[in-house]
Amino acid sequence: RGVVLFCGPYDPTRMDFDSPYGGFMRTVIWSYLGTRDPADPRVADMSLLPHLTSAFPPTFISVGNADPLAPQSYALAEALEAKGVEVDTLFFPPRHEPQLGHEYQLLLSTRDGRLSFERFVAFLAAHSAAPAPAEADAGWRAVRRSPA
């Protein structure tokens, strides 16, 4: 049992809606609430942080160092750790090169994308009820061998 989270908006009340990424986030809240107004009181209901308890499942969180949502992941990891929840993170230093943007985890042709996938698979293996079938392991070995 566990949760895997990649670069999400976990607390919209802490977002800078006037930033270059703010227009996109206004569209996100509009898709859920029918309004683009971040002052709408329902935006606070979208925040995960006030609802965290020590019963939250073990969590793997990863975000790129150039992702506009990176502060959301850092705050969530910190809040989970404060509740005593097992948290495994893959965060990169601010000066890491290449800069890793939103959803870098999907770029398996890159070294950092593969590292994220490897850590993701290891987390799932450690928190799943059953081992992965042999054919899944063989496919993973092929991905790990692909060139950078």
Residue map of PLM features:
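Alpha/beta-hydrolase superfamily serine-hydrolase fold, recognizing
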Residues: 1-148
